Amino acid sequence: MLKAMPASESSGWTLVVPVKTLVAAKTRLSEAAGPHRAALAVAIACDTVEAALSCVIVARIVVVTGDPLAAEALGGVGAHVVGDPEAGLNAALRRGAQEAVRLAPGDAVGALQADLPALRPAELALVLTAAAEFEQAFLPDAADVGTTFYGVRPGVPFTPGFGGESRDRHLRRGAKEICLDGIDSVRRDVDTPDDLRAALALGLGPRTLAMVERIRGGFPSP
């Protein structure tokens, strides 16, 4: 069980971002992205992390990955990188949360998906501010099936339930669902070409946009 300082002593949020090995990343974009798939996955993750670090109430990002190329790129944008225990997504998140508590025992800890290339820091701040009102909270993805964010107050056990129909799983476990207007960029994860087109309509981060422009034929304008 993760232990942290009381909420009143918290100085902000530490977010844990899991990043797959590039050989396994974004396989549903393979047909459209072709040989650029791995580079696109790195670009999406880097834009996500950079935007999150620009959020005024995010103190640091802990990236969990077993891929050396992804680790180098994400470390370059300011993430603290730790190795992936290779035991699944939620195990990776728990490993990152352990490191987060070690680095900053007074911070709230959250898990943020790595595939939010349109992420806006101000919208993330709205989500984190809302999440801080509850012991544990989560944000569903744009399809209302999965989860893009899960977070806990300092001192609350960190028990993420990502994967598949994780919205229902988090609800069953007692996490509070965050329901706000104006936070589309935090819900818009990208797994398919249609998802990427939807993110493009919101406004992509610079690295992802540059990659899309390189492979534009695979991603027609929205």
Swiss-Prot record:
**Entry keyword set:** GTP-binding, Nucleotide-binding, Nucleotidyltransferase, Transferase
Q: What is this protein called?
A: Phosphoenolpyruvate guanylyltransferase
Q: Which gene encodes it?
A: fbiD
**Sample GO molecular function, one term:** GTP binding
One Pfam family cited in the UniProt record for this chain = CofC
What GO biological process terms are annotated to this protein in UniProt? F420-0 metabolic process
Keyword Glycoprotein tagged: no
| Role of this protein | Guanylyltransferase that catalyzes the activation of phosphoenolpyruvate (PEP) as enolpyruvoyl-2-diphospho-5'-guanosine, via the condensation of PEP with GTP. It is involved in the biosynthesis of coenzyme F420, a hydride carrier cofactor.
* InterPro entries, A to Z: CofC (IPR002835), Nucleotide-diphossugar_trans (IPR029044)
Catalytic activity field: phosphoenolpyruvate + GTP + H(+) = enolpyruvoyl-2-diphospho-5'-guanosine + diphosphate
Annotated pathway, please?
Answer: Cofactor biosynthesis; coenzyme F420 biosynthesis
Q: Known PANTHER family for this protein? A: 2-PHOSPHO-L-LACTATE GUANYLYLTRANSFERASE (PTHR40392:SF1)
Task: Give the family from UniProt.
Answer: Belongs to the CofC family.
Task: Tell me its EC number(s), please.
Answer: 2.7.7.105
User: Which residues bind phosphoenolpyruvate per the record?
Assistant: T147, G163, S166
Q: Does the keyword GTP-binding apply?
A: yes
